[in-house]
Amino acid sequence: MMINNLEALKLFAHHKGGGSTANGRNSAGRRLGAKRADGQKINAGSIIFRQRGTKIHPGKNVGIGGDDTLFALTSGVVKFERLGRDRKQVSVYPVEEAK
C-alpha cells in the first residue's frame, strides 16, 4: 500500500495540542485617586477624589458617595488638610468673585 506525502505528514506529526494555563488574565485599572489638585477651583458636584474606603475623609462642603467618592457640595477652592496625626481630609472653601 502506497502512502502519499500529505498523509505521511499527518501520521508523523509530533507536536501535541497546546494546553491551557491558569494565569494569563488581568483586570483594567479602576482610575482611582485625586481628580482635582490642592488650590484648584471647582464647581459644585464635581468629583475631587475617587477611592475605596476612606483614605481621605470629607471636610467642609464635601460630600461622600456610596462608593466613597468625595465630591464638592459648593463651588470654591479645593484644600487638602491633615486631620490629626494619621488622617487626611479635603475641604472646599467658597471664593468671593471680584465684581
UniProtKB/Swiss-Prot annotation:
Top-level taxonomic group: Bacteria
GO BP term (any one): translation
Molecular function, one GO term: structural constituent of ribosome
Propeptide: 1-12
PTM statement from Swiss-Prot or TrEMBL: The N-terminus is cleaved by ribosomal processing cysteine protease Prp.
Keywords for this protein: Ribonucleoprotein, Ribosomal protein
Disulfide linkage: none
Residue numbers spanned by region Disordered: 15-36
A Gene Ontology term for the protein's cellular component: cytosolic large ribosomal subunit
Assigned protein family: Belongs to the bacterial ribosomal protein bL27 family.
Name this polypeptide is given: Large ribosomal subunit protein bL27
Organism: Lactobacillus johnsonii (strain CNCM I-12250 / La1 / NCC 533)
